[in-house]
A protein has these predicted regions:
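Membrane-interfacial amphipathic/re-entrant helices at transmembrane-helix boundaries
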Residues: 1-22, 51, 59-65, 91-96, ...
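Single transmembrane alpha-helix segments in multi-pass membrane proteins
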Residues: 5-55, 83-95, 179, 232-240
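Membrane-embedded helix boundary and interhelical linker motif in transport proteins
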Residues: 11, 33-79, 83, 264-274
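Helix-loop-helix "hairpin" substructures at the membrane interface of multi-pass membrane proteins
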Residues: 16-17, 137-221, 240-245
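Hydrophobic core segments of alpha-helical transmembrane domains in multi-pass membrane transport
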Residues: 49-54, 70-76, 103-111, 150-159, ...
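Transmembrane alpha-helical segments in multi-pass inner-membrane proteins
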Residues: 60-62, 66-71, 193-203, 207-208, ...
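Alpha-helical transmembrane segments within multi-pass membrane transporters and channels
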Residues: 60-104, 110, 245-250, 254, ...
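Transmembrane helix-bundle core of multi-pass membrane transporters
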Residues: 87-164, 191, 256-285, 299, ...
Length: 307
């Protein structure tokens, strides 16, 4: 067993899980409170990356560009909610799926018109561009450690927001009983706009942190959206705690599985069979995990109270 590789892949799994959590936290709130299936959530992840790339170029600072990109993405999401999504709340889920799928196509063409078809890069400052020595001589990219730290901080702040504030009380109540908060005289449209904006900001944060380690390109949010939906189902729709735990589980299993499954299969089969089967099986691991968890807990690991 290569313990150095295992540690590196475990950290990579945590880093991937953190990005999944940021996407899943916003999307699970949107669906849990607004009962809206938003397939275009991955497009907000893409917009966050493009906003960060542009603002970093304009300001000459990645940190300043990232700070400005988060409220920009939140404002963008709130505008989208008010213009394009508000009429979908009374429609069935099939209509929501079709409409938000159309938004994916719209956002892709919108980005193509504004930024062109060629991908962008987000340059990192020198302090984040190197690696950090952890222990026993193991070095790990500094920016990936920053992603993990920022994700944990955001998870803690979300916990405080949801559990200790008036807005959080409304969010918890809305996730459990939307009719109740409406009967109490809460401005539902305003709450929905705030929740959607918060979800857009989280998606944008994930996008701007993913941008420096991959190409910022059209359609970059579509693949990760599918895994995000798996995270939400595993964790429990509407549950921030569930999204966090499930995201880390999925991130670790996906990353570590892809790295070590060929070697594990090689212990029982020939190298040719192991090399052929490992990619297919590794891509199935998170879906097998979802099936196993749903067989035991049909509402996910941590469903909201009253669900």
């Amino acid at each position: 067993m290569n313990w150095t590789l295992l540690l590196e892949q475990t950290l990579n799994g945590f880093q991937f899980g953190i990005l999944l959590f940021l996407l899943a936290a916003g999307l699970t709130l949107i669906f849990g409170i607004m009962d809206l299936i938003n397939l275009a959530h991955g497009s907000l992840y893409m917009m966050g990356a493009y906003f960060a790339a542009t603002l970093t170029k304009w300001t000459g600072s990645f940190l300043l560009g990232a700070i400005l990109a988060i409220p920009a993405c939140m404002a963008f999401g709130m505008i989208v909610e008010m213009i394009a999504l508000r009429t979908l709340y009374t429609r069935n889920h099939l209509d929501q799926v079709l409409a938000t799928f159309g938004l994916i196509l719209f956002f892709n063409e919108f980005v193509r018109l504004l930024w062109g078809p060629i991908g962008l890069d987000i340059p990192l400052p020198e302090v984040l561009n190197g690696s950090v020595e952890l222990f026993l001589g193991i070095r790990y990219p500094a920016f990936r450690l920053v992603i993990i730290a920022v994700g944990i901080l955001v998870a803690f702040l979300l916990y405080l927001l949801v559990s200790r504030t008036k807005l959080g009380m409304l969010i918890r109540a809305g996730a459990s009983n939307r009719q109740m908060i409406s009967a109490l005289g809460v401005n539902i449209n305003f709450l929905y706009t705030i929740v959607f904006g918060l979800g857009a900001a989280l998606a944008g944060l994930a996008g701007l942190m993913a941008g420096p380690i991959m190409t910022v390109e059209i359609g970059m949010g579509e693949g990760i959206l599918i895994i995000t939906l798996v995270v939400i189902v595993i964790g429990g729709v509407g549950s921030i705690k569930g999204a966090f735990v499930a995201a880390l589980l999925v991130g670790l299993i996906d990353t570590v599985g892809r790295s070590f499954l060929p070697d594990i299969l090689g212990l029982f089969f020939s190298n040719d069979v192991a090399d052929t089967a490992a990619p297919a099986i590794s891509s199935m691991l998170i879906y097998l995990l979802m099936a196993l968890i749903l067989a035991v807990k049909p509402q996910g690991l941590f469903p909201p109270r009253g669900a």
